[in-house]
Amino acid sequence: MGKYRLLALDLDGTLLNDRSEISNTNAKWVRHAVEAGVTVCVSTGRGFPSALPFAEQLRLDTPMITVNGGEIWTKPHSLHRRTLLDSQKVMKLHALAEQHDVWFWGYTTNDIYNKERWVGDTITSHWLKFGYYTENLPILNEILKEIQTWDGLEITNSSPYNIEINSQGVSKASALEEVCRMLGYDMSEVVAVGDSLNDIAAIRASGLGVAMGNAQDEVKAAAKVVTGSHQEHGVAQVIQNYVLRT
């Protein structure tokens, strides 16, 4: 094994292609990394139930980071830490979504709600993340400017057309740092790969930060390396060219 001991992989736009599938090429090289002793960690904005099938497909029994770091798992189904988003803030975020008439969603610890199906009692629910989606960028920017004036929020995105909100301090980077503490690794031994703003902190904090070829420009600017796109098996390229190169 080379100098990198942990490979943190975003899912959408990174490990997954446009059909939300792991290509055979990516799967093969992830298995090569695992067999070489590298810890492969799924690191995603998705909730655990949505991320789990991909970890299972790759036969990973390693730590997982879900809802942008809101949950850290020592291995699938074994929760290490969970950081909640204040329900009063979710009420305000929800009201702003209604005001602008945009699509929105929220993750609680046991369900996902959205514009078509919202929770009956926001206050008593245990929230992890809230998000907005619209292709009307002026409206999206208006929402962003508003919530940037509020305290206690960590604001990122997972596409140019959404905004994702966690509790302040929650990020894939802080979660990766905790995973490293759990495993006895140093952040310099981490390769973090992603395509969106919710990946930037981890990309900057890791020994090797990698942006996908399809990544947003800010992500490419933050990364040390740009690999192929999610349609070109960019993750496999990272494993071949950096993770398993001794």
Language model features: what each stretch is:
Residues 2-6, 23, 166, 173-246:
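Mg2+-dependent phosphoryl-transfer enzymes with acidic/Ser/Thr/Gly-rich catalytic loops
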Residues 10:
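Active-site residues of response regulator receiver
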Residues 39, 103, 154, 208-209, ...:
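Residue-level detector of anion-binding/catalytic polar loops
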Residues 96, 100-205, 214:
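Conserved acidic, metal-coordinating active-site core of Asp-based
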